[in-house]
């Protein structure tokens, strides 16, 4: 009998934000897998590290991701990972894939899901997303009353960003990173800099909350977000 593939949402960074269900499945799974940069440590692995010390030894599969936007190098990585994890599942071993935030909110797990769901039993365990975490640490509700919340990936080109932001009521700009200067420029053109809130590494020890004008464009990490409320504090 084949094992089950679990996509575990492990939250935005604070280990205490892992759900009870995700923790139970993590502790039970003999195999865990997680994304990591080509060089360096895995954020996902570091989030769950407090729960792995002292327990039964697990097989760990590190999925090294290239830092490029092109689709095909990443596709090859997911192909190889699906094959390796499939071997464990076919041998009857459950596999828990660790996903920062929520697996199905821009999560890398969806690419394994697309490759493996037709062959194996898959269970997706939702997690605390970066959206809700950033709103909480900023003390700024995502949306109020009948406001429409728009999620905008910062890698969009400048014209697309401007079009998405121009008429939006409440906006979360995600994956800011090296696109900060472009995003700042668009917000300035739309007169929204004063209504924007910036946070990086929300809920982590390295968390920082800054005004947009205080942010150095050269040092913005991938895990950063800008929340914008066109109507100001619509919840007051």
Language model: regions and residue ranges:
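Glycine-rich, flexible N-terminal cofactor/catalytic loop recognition
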Residues: 1-63, 163-167, 215-216
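General beta-strand structural signal in soluble alpha/beta enzymes
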Residues: 34, 62, 97-99, 124-127, ...
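Short, well-ordered alpha-helix to beta-strand connector turns
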Residues: 26-30, 92, 120, 168, ...
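Short, solvent-exposed amphipathic alpha-helical segments in soluble enzyme
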Residues: 22-25, 49-52, 112-115, 139, ...
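Glycine/small-residue-rich loop that forms an oxyanion/phosphate-binding "nest" at active or ligand-binding sites
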Residues: 61-93, 97
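Class I SAM-dependent methyltransferase SAM-binding "motif I" and its flanking Rossmann-like core
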Residues: 101-167, 217, 230-234
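Short acidic active-site motifs
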Residues: 21, 84, 157-161
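A contiguous loop/helix-start segment that scaffolds small-molecule binding in enzyme catalytic cores
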Residues: 5, 165-236
